[in-house]
Curated annotation (Swiss-Prot):
Low complexity bias (residue ranges): 248-270
Disordered as annotated region, ranges: 153-277, 517-538
Organism domain of life: Eukaryota
Compartments where located: Nucleus
Record field: compositional bias (Polar residues): 210-225
Organism expressing this protein natively: Arabidopsis thaliana
Protein's UniProt name: Probable WRKY transcription factor 31
Length: 538
């Protein structure tokens, strides 16, 4: 920046006015800034020189090239750095010292600006470093959390696997204990094959339960449709195996003795005997009764798990399983008779492994005793099914040839209890020679007692039988009855044990029950009469 010292008037102007000579009259004094003082001085000097040459008596006022300090104090600083005095040369009027100062100041200013920018960049760099450090810290924390979660998940999975393994082992031990402690079911051959047969009869869903370690009830409730399909498939496969086995005689060496004797050695006979016994692993009890309902009421709780159409019968066959306890092996099939739609055929298979309610003991005891005695009579020889001298034939067939029949047309022995036949008047011998029918026609006979008596009679007679290679459950079925019925059953048991003929024993048992009931009714009537007489006397 350039500074021009300017004087706007003052004592110097007055002094100059006092010193004005006549030669300076042509100069005009103005109160303005004269920016051309140098030129004016040059012209004035030339004029003075000319005057000197002419008269040599001209007064010349010499102006100094520098402005006095006291005059400079009155100058106005306009910031232009201009000089009003002559520097004595033709050089630039810009002061070299001032220009150098300006350059230094400019450099300092730029340096200060650069320093400020550097400071800002340092601050920004520090902020970025802090952000990077925070991000690194967060990443490390998340990584540690992820590792901890993965370890917890692995520990949880390992603990679950360990628990599942323990549960499966416990389930296996329980099954082994059940194989040892629980009595064999009535469809097995003998006590020696209890463990092997139990292992062979384990269904697919039970094997799945052992692998997974889950209880059977959870698996059944989780997917009942799949369980029903599997069970239905098992029933169908068993029926197909029955039809295929009995359709081709070569598959059953029991009914082909020539093939077993053709070898003429002892090993072949042993193999044929084992095959024949394997054929008799299960027994089924079929009950025919007239009912309009979908199934007869036997006191148990059932769940339907399948249905299919059978050959030769337009009515579908329904499959049920007992749901009163988890893992109960009892199954039943319900189907209408093709010839008479009013007859409902119910086929039971298996034995309950849980306590039964009073309403279910009658049918369960009857079917269990019938199947057990059927197997006990069939194990004596290969012709045991067809031999009328076996225990069951001697027990039931003399009573009524139409009440119970034994089927040998299937690999599994089946006994059919026909409850639809009524006494026929055209055949008087059936009623005369049948003690069971005689007592069934007596007045006051209660049909609900018959299954209990038959079941208990079969049970006691089977205990006394020498043909039986079986053992019924150690815990007998619980028959919930009144005290009078219990006394009647005990009397029937004593009569059956003392009489070798089952028909006569059964007749004696029913007689004792009827007499006990009538005696109890007479006692009740006598007590009522005595009470009424006492009341009237009072």
């Amino acid at each position: 920046m350039f500074r021009f010292p300017v004087s706007l008037g003052g004592s110097r102007d007055e002094d100059r006015h006092d010193q004005i000579t006549p030669l300076d009259d042509h100069r005009v004094v103005v109160d303005e800034v004269d920016f051309f003082s140098e030129k004016r001085d040059r012209v004035s000097r030339e004029n003075i020189n000319d005057d000197d040459d002419e008269g040599n008596k001209v007064l010349i006022k010499m102006e100094g090239s520098r402005v006095e300090e006291n005059d400079r104090s009155r100058d106005v600083n306009i910031g232009l750095n201009l000089l009003t005095a002559n520097t004595g040369s033709d050089e630039s009027t810009v002061d070299d010292g001032l220009s150098m100062d300006m350059e230094d100041k400019r450099a300092k200013i730029e340096n200060a600006q650069l320093q400020e920018e550097l400071k800002k960049m340092k601050i920004e760099n520090q902020r970025l470093r802090d952000m990077l450090s925070q991000a690194t810290t967060n990443f490390n924390a998340l990584q540690m959390q992820l590792v901890a979660v993965m370890r917890q998940q692995e520990q949880r999975n390992s603990s679950q696997d360990h628990l599942l393994a323990q549960e499966s082992k416990a389930e296996g031990r329980k099954r082994q204990e059940l194989q040892i402690m629980v009595p064999r079911q009535f469809m097995d051959l003998g006590p020696s094959s209890g463990a092997a047969e139990h292992g062979a009869e384990v269904s697919s869903e039970e094997r799945t339960t052992v692998r997974s370690g889950s209880p059977p009830s959870l698996l059944e409730s989780s997917n009942p449709r799949e369980n029903g399909k599997r069970l239905l498939g098992r029933e169908e496969s068993s029926e197909e195996s029955e039809s295929n086995a009995w359709g081709n005689p070569n598959k059953v060496p029991k009914h082909n003795p020539s093939s077993s004797n053709s070898n003429g050695n002892r090993n072949g006979n042993v193999i044929d005997q084992s095959a024949a016994e394997a054929t008799m692993r299960k027994a089924r009890v079929s009950v025919r009764a007239r009912s309009e309902a979908a199934m007869i009421s036997d006191g148990c709780q059932w769940r339907k798990y399948g249905q299919k159409m059978a050959k030769g019968n337009p009515c579908p066959r329904a499959y049920y399983r007992c749901t009163m306890a988890g893992g109960c092996p009892v199954r039943k099939q319900v189907q209408r008779c093709a010839e008479d739609r009013s007859i409902l055929i119910t086929t039971y298979e298996g034995n309950h492994n849980h306590p039964l309610p009073p309403a279910a003991t009658a049918m369960a005891s009857t079917t269990t005793a019938a199947a057990s005695m059927l197997l006990s009579g069939s194990m004596s020889s290969q012709d045991g099914l067809m031999n009328p001298t076996n225990l069951l034939a001697r027990a039931i067939l003399p009573c009524s040839s139409s009440m119970a029949t034994i089927s040998a047309s299937a690999p599994f022995p089946t006994i059919t209890l026909d409850l639809t036949n009524s006494p026929n008047g055209n055949n008087p011998n059936m009623t005369t020679n049948n003690p069971l029918m005689q007592f069934a026609q007596r007045p006051g006979f209660n049909p609900a007692v018959l299954p209990q008596v038959v079941g208990q009679a079969m049970y006691n007679n089977q205990q006394q039988s020498k043909f039986s290679g079986l053992q019924l459950p150690a815990q007998p079925l619980q028959i919930a009855a009144t005290s009078s019925v219990a006394e009647s059953v005990s009397a029937a048991s004593a009569a059956i044990a003392s009489d070798p003929n089952f028909a006569a024993a059964l007749a004696a048992a029913i007689t004792s029950i009827m007499n006990g009931s009538s005696h109890q009714n007479n006692n009740t009537n006598n007590n009522n009469v005595a009470t009424s007489n006492n009341d009237s006397r009072q």
